[in-house]
Amino acid sequence: MHLLWRLLVLLLGLLALPSALPKQPWPGLTKAHKDGRSTLARIIAQGLLKLNAEGRIQSMRLLDRLNVSGTVAPGMVGWLIGGMNFQQQQEISINITNVQLDCGGIQMAFPKEWFSANITLEFDIEFKLPFNSNIIKTHACMGLTAESWLEKDEFGRRELVMGRCRMEPSSGGASMSTEETSPKMKHFLHNLRESLGKVIPNLVESQVCPLIGEILRQLDVKLLKGLVGACS
């Protein structure tokens, strides 16, 4: 009788066991979902840092690009340097400083194994003009999207395909803000900002997009598949 009672207690304990388990078995999957995205974003961010993406952007020669025909407001550069001697022309400078670049997140789509890296970029632009003793500063905030996916070849092997890599339509000059300047400079700076808004996105794309492709191609396809699959 004592043995039968012990078996009955054990049976009741086993029947009660499922109720003690978590009702939702997804916490682990949720963690993997977050980890897959964050790991890939971290790999891209660290890769951009290692490949000196910020330094490349900071060294872009904006003034040279503005002097290329068709990239500036009509007559702007001519108006700027037309009444200057050679020494004054040499004093003109447009420099990028305080570059901050990061991978802000990863978007994914299934079952196509497609993912998109969202790159955030901020920097200051400093203007030094011979007829103005102060350094004029503007601030730019931009976003760049780089698309990629894994595609099977005729033998069923996956390979990385790089898609579009471009600045977001709302990026560029639209997000620039200028510090207070004299009325004499406002019209010139307005035209200059518009011109930079046309020039900078292409320059940034030419510097950052090849680096993202280089970073992703260095990853083992199985590792990349695992990161993407962790979020499915």
From Swiss-Prot:
Predominant subcellular localization, coarse grouping: secreted
Molecular function GO terms recorded: lipid binding
Sequence similarity: Belongs to the BPI/LBP/Plunc superfamily. Plunc family.
Organism domain of life: Eukaryota
This protein's UniProt keywords: Disulfide bond, Glycoprotein, Secreted, Signal
Disulfide bonds: 165-209
Gene that encodes the chain: Bpifa3
Glycosylation sites: 67, 95, 118
Lineage of the organism: Eukaryota, Metazoa, Chordata, Craniata, Vertebrata
Gene Ontology cellular-component terms listed: extracellular region
PANTHER family: BPI FOLD-CONTAINING FAMILY A MEMBER 3 (PTHR47736:SF1)
Name of the protein in its database record: BPI fold-containing family A member 3
Annotated compartments: Secreted
Signal sequence interval, chain numbering: 1-22
